[in-house]
Regions:
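N-terminal intrinsically disordered/low-complexity leader segments
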Residues: 1-9, 153, 199-210
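Helix-turn-helix
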Residues: 2, 13, 17, 21-55, ...
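An amphipathic alpha-helix signature
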Residues: 15, 86, 133, 137-141, ...
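Hydrophobic alpha-helical connector segments
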Residues: 59, 73-105, 155-162
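Short, basic, alpha-helical segments at the C-terminal edge of helix-turn-helix-like DNA-binding modules
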Residues: 62-68
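Amphipathic alpha-helical packing segments from all-alpha helical-bundle domains
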Residues: 119-146, 157
Length: 210
């Protein structure tokens, strides 16, 4: 039985390059020529590996999530729910305004999915965002069980609050807001956090996820 020709490129490296293209140009704005040029592969290789532009974008989103896994792990590992909120929003401010030049400002999940046309991409993006929200909700439900949050606290609403704030931070970053400005926004959002009475920001604000 014949097997296909072995892949002649590193899939993860190619996806990392595709991330930058989709992030800067959006799904509709990224042409196949742009993508293959950035990824260093030819169109047949792209189609053989990913099936279509839509298939490539879905793989890009999975890769983007994979790169952020350690960040979400550090968020939910914070010892208190107030520190969970702080780690999350300050971390988002950090990577949304990435000054290293590795990534465009903002968030791929928001900018990359603009003007997707008649595809399943909006549903896929919604699923990815819902997964992040579910991680936060689970952490807050655990805090309720441990007695850190009141029994009538709405874990889902708290998770949604953080997601809404983080989306706003990313939009502002894409519009040109500086890291300092985004941290100020995050700090204000944290003053409204219902579980952080008397909480003082303590995190190293120079930290941002890779």
């Amino acid at each position: 039985m014949r097997t296909g020709r072995p892949r002649s490129f590193c899939k993860d490296e190619a996806l990392d390059k595709a991330i930058a293209v989709f992030w800067r140009q959006g799904y509709e704005g990224a042409s196949m020529a742009d993508l293959t040029r950035a990824m260093g592969i030819n169109p047949p290789s792209l189609y053989a590996c990913f099936g279509s532009k839509e298939g490539l974008f879905k793989a890009v989103l999975d890769r983007y999530d994979q790169r952020r896994n350690s960040f979400m792990e550090s968020v939910v590992a914070a010892p208190t729910v107030a520190q969970v909120a702080e780690t999350f929003l300050m971390g988002v401010a950090g990577f949304a305004s990435d000054t290293s030049g590795r990534n465009p400002p903002g968030c791929l999940m928001l900018q990359g999915g603009l003007s997707c046309g008649d595809t399943t991409i909006p549903d896929v993006l919604a699923r990815h965002r819902a997964e992040k929200e579910a991680i936060l909700r689970t952490r807050f439900e655990q805090a309720k069980e441990a007695g850190e949050l009141a029994g009538n606290a709405d874990a889902a609403a708290l998770a949604r609050y953080l997601m809404v704030m983080s989306n706003g931070i990313c939009v502002q970053a894409a519009a040109g807001a500086t890291l300092e400005e985004l941290r100020e926004v995050a700090a204000i959002a944290l003053t409204n956090w219902p579980a952080n009475a008397g909480h003082k920001l303590h995190q190293d604000l120079t930290h941002s996820p890779a």
